[in-house]
């Protein structure tokens, strides 16, 4: 019996466009950004801001140093939002209309810029925020851990009071799905931007 549904952000609730993000960061003058930005796990300063080792002001200062000029919060936010080619509003309608009997959680490798956006009235046309659709968000930049670190999943299960066998996890990252399954969590790996509603309906019928 499934009681909990855990969703990733990028690739699952957002359609990702890595090339646009690379273009925007390059336009800011950040060198070698293609070596640091990855669809699933970042490296360098981009990893440090995602795993909480670096604060947003520290990250902004580091990128400014790389670019050789002062970058603003809005400069970097605009570049990061290149990743988010589309927020799939219909998926939030699905969560609201069909998943009301389940506990909804977010587990995401993300950064302060994206989290600020998710909690703003710009997130969806309705003005609703991400938090209004879920019981709790487990954001890497706030938790100090990134997927596929086993500890991140174990912390989520503990703090969310979830039983693995009662949990369904959606993530577009192969290593993340593999770790979830290793812990006994039911998992599905959608393609970037996939409409996974019918698949979730099917899985819930099979697992319930």
Please give the residue ranges for each predicted region:
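Proline-centered loop/turn at the N-terminus of a beta-strand
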Residues: 103-105, 186
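Asp-based, Mg2+/Mn2+-dependent phosphohydrolase catalytic module
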Residues: 1-3, 111-112, 117-208
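Catalytic-core regions built around general acid/base machinery
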Residues: 90-101, 133
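N-terminal helical cap/lid subdomain that shapes the substrate entry/recognition surface
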Residues: 2-89, 100, 111-115, 202
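Short amphipathic alpha-helical segments and helix-helix/interface helices
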Residues: 92-96, 106, 153, 177
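Generic structural signal for small/hydrophobic residues in well-ordered secondary structure
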Residues: 8-11, 52, 106, 137, ...
């Amino acid at each position: 019996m499934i009681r909990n549904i855990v969703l990733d952000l990028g690739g699952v609730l957002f359609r990702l466009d890595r090339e646009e993000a690379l273009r925007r960061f390059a336009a800011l003058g950040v060198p070698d950004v293609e070596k640091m930005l990855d669809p699933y796990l970042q490296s360098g300063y981009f990893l440090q801001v995602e795993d909480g080792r670096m604060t947003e002001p520290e990250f902004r200062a580091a990128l400014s140093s790389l670019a050789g000029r002062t970058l603003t919060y809005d400069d970097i936010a605009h570049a990061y939002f290149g990743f988010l080619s589309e927020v799939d509003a219909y998926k939030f309608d699905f969560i609201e209309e069909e998943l009301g009997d389940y506990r909804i959680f977010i587990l995401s490798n993300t950064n302060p810029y994206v989290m600020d956006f998710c909690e703003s009235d710009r997130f969806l046309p309705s003005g609703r925020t991400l938090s209004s659709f879920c019981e709790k968000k487990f954001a890497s930049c706030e938790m100090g851990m990134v997927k596929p670190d086993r500890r991140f999943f174990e912390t989520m299960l503990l703090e969310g009071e979830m039983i693995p066998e009662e949990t369904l996890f959606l993530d577009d990252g192969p290593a993340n799905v593999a770790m979830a399954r290793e812990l006994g969590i039911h998992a599905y790996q959608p393609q970037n931007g996939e409409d996974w509603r019918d698949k979730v309906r099917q899985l819930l019928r099979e697992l319930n």
